[in-house]
Every structure is written in C-alpha cells, then in structure tokens.
Design a protein with these regions (language model features):
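Conserved catalytic core of sirtuin-type NAD+-dependent deacylases
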Residues: 1-217
Length: 217
C-alpha cells in the first residue's frame, strides 16, 4: 500500500513538473470537520438550506442555517489549503475552482480563486443588496419577533438572504463560465476531495480531456 502511494505521488509530481497550465478543483469537505457544508454542495444542509425553505419557513431556515454558516466561517485553514496556496504562489497551479463555501482557500492565500457557490461569510438584502456580516445577522434575528432578519436601511426592511447559492438556485453564473474557461485552457486538471456527484461540476473534468489535457483525481 505504501509503495502504491509513493508511486502515485511520484506520478503526480511528474505531471505537475510537466504541466504549464495546471488548474485545481476542490470539493466541499477540504476544510470541513463535520457534515455541515453548504446546501449546494449536496450535504445535510439540503434538508433546510434551500430557496423553498427560505421562502416558506424563513424562521426555520435561519435557525438551522446561521449556526452552520458561523461554524464554516470559523474553520481553520488546513495543510491542504496551505499546500495549494504554495503551489499557486510558485506558479505550479494557476487557478483553483472550489465547491467549498468556507472561503478557506482565500484565507490561505490563493490569488485566483473561483467559488462556484460563492461563500457563507455574509448575507444580503434581497431587495437593495446591502451586505451584512454573520454577526450582524445574528443580532437582527435575536431582535426580530418572528426570527427573520431584515434589512436595516431606512425605508427598506426587506428580509435578508445568504449571499451564497441555495438548493433550488443556479450556481454563480460568472464563476461557472470562468471555471469552464479555465478547464478548457489547462493542460492538467487536478480533482481534490470531491466525489463529482453534482452537476454541472461533475462534468468539469471531461472538458480538459476532450481537448487533450490530463486529469488527476
């Protein structure tokens, strides 16, 4: 088993050394410590973190979503995040596409980061787009009679929503377009810590393959 692992590591090192345009894709659990990842990532969050629940049972949505969003925002950068950031800093990796919502890649120092689900670090007004930190949202929930945070801008008062995507919503269009462009551009596509179960991201590794690139999973 150790010999097989050593051989895989050597082959990956050779692929990286021979690549001029490497792009990495990471899954939702690279920085997770438990099953508390974002709705769009296909985890237990999908039971309540959906657009439908937000619209029909907003108090239940916020009761369940906000503690998990806070947990995700407080996660520590892992050695895997640091290693990828160092590879990007050294020019070995040129961009990172991630399904994660904890923003840990950015905190690790990744410069060219594509977050296809955005992240859970903030919420926004669904009408005027004012942005609120999670701590502010908690205060608004505590002060609300119905447990629903609302915009504090004078004359607005519209309910807030997470900045990131929810079940039942399309992914961030600009990020998806850029992810496809980078997958088509690269000559080596690394797939890390994702089971490739959710479309359209599950189809992304096929893009470089069709253009003669290599994929390492």
């Amino acid at each position: 088993m150790a010999d097989d692992l050593d051989g895989d590591i050597r082959r990956l090192a050779d692929l990286l050394a021979g690549s001029e345009r490497c792009v990495a894709m990471t899954g939702v659990r690279l920085g997770a410590t438990e099953d508390t990842e974002a709705a769009a990532a296909g985890s237990a969050w999908g039971e309540f973190a959906s657009l439908e629940v937000l619209l029909t049972e907003p108090a239940r949505f916020w009761e369940n979503w906000l503690p998990r969003a806070i947990e995700a925002s407080e996660r520590e950068v892992t050695p895997a995040h640091r290693a990828l950031a160092r590879l990007e800093g050294a020019g070995v990796i040129h961009a990172i596409i991630t399904q994660a919502v904890d923003h840990l890649h950015a905190r690790a120092g990744d410069g060219d980061l594509i977050e296809v689900h955005a992240n859970v670090l903030s919420c926004r007004c669904a009408r005027c787009d004012d942005v609120y930190a999670l701590s502010e949202v908690q205060g608004l929930i505590d002060a609300a009679d119905d447990g629903v945070p609302r915009c504090t801008r004078e004359g607005c008062g519209y309910p807030l929503r997470p900045t990131g995507t929810l079940w039942g919503e399309p992914l961030v269009e600009e990020a998806i377009i850029r992810a496809w462009d980078m997958a088509a551009w690269c000559d080596l596509f690394l797939v890390l810590d994702t089971q490739l179960r959710t479309d359209p991201m599950a189809m992304l590794p096929s893009v470089p393959l069709k253009r003669g690139g290599k994929v390492a999973i």
